[in-house]
Structure formats: C-alpha cells, structure tokens
Amino acid sequence: MNDLKLDKVSKVLKEVRKSVPLVHCITNYVTINDCANILLSYGASPAMCEAYDEVFDFVKISSALYINIGTFTREQESSAILAAVSAKTHNIPVVLDPVACAAIPKKIQFIDKLFKVGRVDVIKGNIGEIKFLAGETSNVKGVDSLEDGEGALECSRILSEKYNCVVAATGKKDFIVQGKNSAIIENGTEMLTNITGAGCMLGALCAAACGAFEDKFMAVVGAILSINIASEEAYKEAKAPGSFRVKLIDCIYELSEEKLKKEGKIAWN
C-alpha cells in the first residue's frame, strides 16, 4: 500500500510537467524571484501579478493561486482578497502561506477574511505558524519557527477540520494532513533553514502541484517531497548557503519520478 501511495505521489511531478500549470502568485518582495525560478524549474509557468485592477481576471485563466503574506502591503491585501473571490467564483485552487502570522495579529484578521469571502484549499506554514493558527502557544522568532515538531500533527489535524482544507506544517519533519489522512515526510536537509525563501518556494510548488493534480493532499505531499529530495541532492555538491540556493533550483529541474520513488521517506496514517 505504501509503495502504491509513493507511486501516486511521484506522478504529481509528471502531471505538473505535462500540464505546465499557470501559477498566479501574490507573494513577498524578498523571495519573489526565487519563487518564479523554482516554478519554472518544476515545470510550471509563474505569473507574479498583484495589481488590483488585474487580479480578478488573471485568476480566471490561472491553474492555481498562491497567496504569501510575508511582506503584505495594503494593495497586496486588497488584491489577494479580490483574487481569492475570483478563485472561489471560478473554482481555482488556492494555497495560503501565513508567513509571520504568529508575530503580527493583523495577519490573522486577513486570514479570517480570506476564508469568509474567498477560498483556501491548502494552508502551508512552518510548525510555529500552524500551531498558532490552531489556537496553541507557539515558539516563533519573526518569520522563523523555533518549534521542534511536538504537537504538529495534532494541530494540523485541528486546523484541517476547522477549515476543511489540506494543512502542511514544515520543520525537521513535515506533516501533511487532510481530514483523517496524514503523511510525515522525513527527507530534507538543515541547509534549507540557512537560505531565505525556502518556505516561500515550497508554497509556490504546492500551488503548482494543486493546479495540476486533482488530489490536493497527494499534490502537497508530492511538492514537499520534491523540494526535500532536491535539497538533499543539492547539499551533496553545495555546502554553503549561496551555492546551495542556486543548486536547489537546478536539482528541482533535474528531479525525476524514479528519484522520488527511490528516495522518498514517508510515514502514512
């Protein structure tokens, strides 16, 4: 059974490269270029469109919408709400990355509004952010989580049931939950924490996967497994942050279904 699931997860990569999903990103200025480049390497087509007068119509032609609230401006907030309304109207999957929501209360107000007027299919955050959204005390420092993973699965399940969506909590181990289904991924490298934007790039990949693959739970598992295995490959040749960041994008480009099936370390429940 586990081999069959891993086989399905590996097919996410195949579907992304076959369909070349158009991923509409409203994201932060720190990592916008990295998100665009890793989407291209994954096989998707990025569009970093955030103008208020354009987003409603642009979502119509997109395969998925990625909303990252890392450096949110007032215009971005207005554009993201309108884009989410369009996504709800036109049945476009939405991935939300609640960056620094545990540190800035106003971000919670935006998230609440997003669920009320728009749609969210996936919440992808670090463990600290996910625990905070689930109503638990979390240990964070700005945009970074200081959590060790304790309680992450339970909090992800609470949040998934509350919002009826896929929840991914990332850390040393990555926890993905949808209802009663869960997966824990143990691939990856600590070097991901030494570059800015690893989580943002992952969120973009999750959106691409959701835009290409009908099973959103498996799509998110596939996206996370992809960046984790790519990071392991990158670290074999790049031991410092600058070269690792570049090599990570290269390794996403070079990734194969066979590599995912061979190297994947996933515990299913």
Swiss-Prot record:
Residues binding ATP: K124, T170
Gene: thiM
Residues engaged in binding substrate: M48, G197
Organism: Clostridium kluyveri (strain ATCC 8527 / DSM 555 / NBRC 12016 / NCIMB 10680 / K1)
One Pfam family named in its UniProt record: HK
Pathway annotation from the record: Cofactor biosynthesis; thiamine diphosphate biosynthesis; 4-methyl-5-(2-phosphoethyl)-thiazole from 5-(2-hydroxyethyl)-4-methylthiazole: step 1/1
Name of the featured protein: Hydroxyethylthiazole kinase
Family: Belongs to the Thz kinase family.
Enzyme Commission number: 2.7.1.50
GO molecular function, one term: magnesium ion binding
Stored SUPFAM superfamilies: Ribokinase-like
Cofactor dependence: Mg(2+)
InterPro entries xref list: Hyethyz_kinase, Ribokinase-like
Alphabetically ordered keywords of this record: ATP-binding, Kinase, Magnesium, Metal-binding, Nucleotide-binding, Thiamine biosynthesis, Transferase
Top-level taxon: Bacteria
Function: Catalyzes the phosphorylation of the hydroxyl group of 4-methyl-5-beta-hydroxyethylthiazole (THZ).
One BP annotation, GO: thiamine biosynthetic process
Catalytic activity: 5-(2-hydroxyethyl)-4-methylthiazole + ATP = 4-methyl-5-(2-phosphooxyethyl)-thiazole + ADP + H(+)
Broadest EC class assigned to this enzyme: transferase
CDD domains in the record: THZ_kinase
